Amino acid sequence: MDAQIKNPTDQMMKITTIAFLLLCSLTVAAQKPDVSKVWVADLGNGKYKNPVLDADYSDPDAIRVGDDFYMVSSSFDAVPGLPILHSKDLVNWTIIGHALKRQIPFEHFSKTQHGNGVWAPAIRFYKGEFYIYYPDPDFGIYLTKAKSATGPWSEPVLVEAGKGLIDPCPLWDEDGKVYLVHAYAGSRAGIKSIIVVKKLNAAGDKVMDEGKLVYDGHELDPTIEGPKFYKRNGYYYIFAPAGGVATGWQLVLRSKNVYGPYERKVVMDQGKSPINGPHQGAWVDTPTGEDWFLHFQDKEAYGRVMHLQPMKWINNWPVIGVDADGDGIGTPVLTYQKPKITKPTAIVTPAESDEFNSTNLGLQWQWQANPSATWSFLNPTNGSLRLYSVKMPDSAKNYWEVPNLLLQKFPTEQFTVTTKLTFTPNTKLENEKAGLIIAGLSYANIAVKSKKDGLYLVYTTCSAADKGKAEKEEVVVKLNTKDVQLRVTVNKGAQCQFSYSLDGLTFINVKDVFQAEPGKWIGAKVGLFCVRTQQTNDAGYADFDWFRIN
């Protein structure tokens, strides 16, 4: 027998082994953590750069439970709401879930509610349970709880009903008493720049009194808000930002009595750094005994991005950032040594791209309102996301009021998004439309649109969408195919260049460059949509093969 001919049994075993190894490698690849191609804060040399999250995670609050750090942030009317992030070192973060699968009241949030909904939340861990307190400025302060940070989270309960009650944070005292600190939104309450402390019941789910006003910031600290409550060395501490989102400072109040009087100290401001308005966030300590502070910076169209600052205590006052001139007021750092942790951790980032190979949307995605099951379908057989054309609300003047926009945050200042779209319209209708959008107070999109004589690629812009202004739509080209790749490149200054490709190789720019704008209290977003203007007994649909950020 020729020496090159193997024993059939041996050959079958080899094939089986190769197949097994291939399956293992695919499984490992599928479980590989997300690492952004556009922004990674971990420099890989024991240092990090700010922002640690160059995306819109406004009003962050964080805690440590053992060796794990958990963070929440405002989500306003985006659903799912109250994103929960996890880290092992305060630098590398991943999204692990949302505390709100839908927003209550459900009917109210079935429509877009820009700027409303979930404002600055607080997360705490007490006696084996996670607590998240969050304010809705139109309804009051809510509480949701869970045994695990990944959920399931309890149905929110109303801790206190009222308008303009914002930014709550609890404190469990050593004597068993429970307190809640919060601020006021002038737009609803008719007053702002004040901080109030109230008693909670033992369960922490009901306010027990009218509270006491413990600090008035009108003279020295206008727009004081976002208070976070701590106790250390016999002092009650209220960490709170003041001076406005883009230009303010970080303030700390302290007192030996929970109701004051409170001493005041500015502990961080911009100084000579390029990080404007550094404030509102969370003090956390590490298992190794270090202190750190997470806060946001307002970057207009890019939203409120999250920074990590070193922190130390001097004479029972915190100093946040680096105090180079010794005045007791820190300034933010751009790069710094990473926190010391007990075990090394891998470089990870929140998910951005999506191949749509799962039966669930990636945790980076949010709708503009409470979603319906009829809006989308994830098909794991061919690895695609199908968006059905949903009729726009009769009252909608433009996409500002369209709930079924599927969006995610800008991941950094410069990036490119590309998606592959196959559009199958309902042939009984006209003006079904599906595509790629940059959303904010103004918006732009590149899309495929159905007309009587076929499919067209169109480019649409809408200035002052929040004011009800009309769109401007231009036909780019008549299509001879249902398949097209759509792209938007976001450059510095949030300048957005849309383009398309019919062969997947050559991309052709549309003639205009669009200036992205923030939304209501949020940064601009990028995402997908499929809509129609008429009601009928069935919908067309768009199949998105993938969504890639580079």
Language model: regions and residue ranges:
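Carbohydrate-active catalytic/glycan-binding domains of CAZyme proteins
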Residues: 31-550
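Bacterial Sec-dependent N-terminal signal peptides
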Residues: 1-33
